[in-house]
């Protein structure tokens, strides 16, 4: 039955959901890559769709910006709609010179300045990591398409406009492959509810050089990331 934030019914969603932050990107993914698409929810214009990719039922739904928004949608999808795997397909910023705009990065783990996982883990450090098989399948899917990917730690920031830009130098030193706002929270939700999760991101801007993509590009391109995510789902079924 419908939840406060998702007006769908049990069975409307596939067991695997791709989740971009932007609901317009969710619509783009559904219309571009899926067949037999049905819109299944639209509360607060956070669109959700279900269709098939090469015959495999897959859903896609936006999650908004930041850990709180992402956690709400992901929790309801898992608890109330039977979703087993969530793949974030979003954008991130780069801090390392070896990572360029439009590169694809896979979040094997996620650091954060949020306290959300300490709240759920009785104030202890929780190692927020992706599901290993999902990481492996995403890397294999990328290799099969000849797409170079970077695998490593993301940093999930609470603030988009940080008051301490020197933190980016520390992230670079520690080998952070991308800065975004959700992965650490979604890995915590997955662990709490016994689901599996992975964040795949395309670098939309470089924090050090200032190079960036446009909002239109972020909403309607980044196709390599989508194909990696979709192909990885098929590999996970084997």
Curated annotation (Swiss-Prot):
Superkingdom to which the source organism belongs: Bacteria
Catalytic reaction annotation: a purine D-ribonucleoside + phosphate = a purine nucleobase + alpha-D-ribose 1-phosphate; a purine 2'-deoxy-D-ribonucleoside + phosphate = a purine nucleobase + 2-deoxy-alpha-D-ribose 1-phosphate
Residues holding phosphate: 21, 25, 44, 88-91
Record-marked site positions (Important for catalytic activity): 218
One cellular component (GO) term of this entry: cytosol
EC code: 2.4.2.1
Binding site for a purine D-ribonucleoside: 5, 180-182, 204-205
Any GO BP annotation: purine nucleoside catabolic process
A GO molecular function held by the record: purine-nucleoside phosphorylase activity
InterPro entries: DeoD-type (IPR004402), Nucleoside_phosphorylase_CS (IPR018016), Nucleoside_phosphorylase_d (IPR000845), Nucleoside_phosphorylase_sf (IPR035994)
Keywords for the protein's UniProt record, in alphabetical order: Glycosyltransferase, Transferase
Gene3D superfamilies per UniProt: Nucleoside phosphorylase domain (3.40.50.1580)
Xref: Pfam families: PNP_UDP_1 (PF01048)
Active-site residues, as the UniProt record annotates them: 205
Role description: Catalyzes the reversible phosphorolytic breakdown of the N-glycosidic bond in the beta-(deoxy)ribonucleoside molecules, with the formation of the corresponding free purine bases and pentose-1-phosphate.
Subunit-structure text: Homohexamer; trimer of homodimers.
The family this protein is said to belong to: Belongs to the PNP/UDP phosphorylase family.
HAMAP family for this protein: Pur_nucleosid_phosp (MF_01627)
Name listed for the protein in its UniProt record: Purine nucleoside phosphorylase DeoD-type 1
Organism: Aliivibrio fischeri (strain ATCC 700601 / ES114)
Phylogenetic lineage: Bacteria, Pseudomonadati, Pseudomonadota, Gammaproteobacteria, Vibrionales
């Amino acid at each position: 039955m419908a939840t406060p934030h998702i007006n769908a019914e049990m069975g409307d969603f596939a067991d695997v959901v791709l989740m971009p932050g932007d609901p317009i990107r969710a619509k783009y993914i559904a219309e571009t890559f899926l067949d037999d698409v049905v819109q299944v929810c639209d509360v607060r214009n956070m669109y959700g769709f279900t269709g098939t990719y090469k015959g495999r039922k897959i859903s896609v739904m936006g999650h908004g910006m930041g850990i709180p928004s992402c956690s709400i949608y992901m929790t309801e999808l898992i608890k109330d709609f039977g979703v087993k795997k969530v793949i974030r397909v979003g954008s991130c910023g780069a801090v390392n010179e070896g990572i360029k705009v439009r590169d694809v990065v896979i979040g094997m783990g996620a650091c954060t300045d949020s306290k959300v996982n300490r709240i759920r883990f009785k104030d202890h450090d929780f190692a927020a990591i992706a599901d290993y098989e999902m990481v492996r399948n995403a890397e294999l899917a990328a290799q099969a398409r000849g797409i170079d990917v970077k695998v490593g730690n993301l940093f999930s920031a609470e603030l988009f406009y940080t008051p301490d830009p020197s933190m980016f130098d520390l992230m670079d030193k520690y080998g952070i492959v991308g800065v975004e706002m959700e992965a650490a929270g979604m890995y915590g939700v997955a662990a709490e509810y016994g689901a599996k999760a992975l964040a795949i991101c395309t670098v939309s801007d470089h924090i050090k050089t200032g190079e960036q993509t446009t909002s239109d590009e972020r909403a309607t391109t980044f196709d390599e990331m989508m194909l990696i995510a979709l192909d990885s789902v098929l590999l996970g079924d084997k």
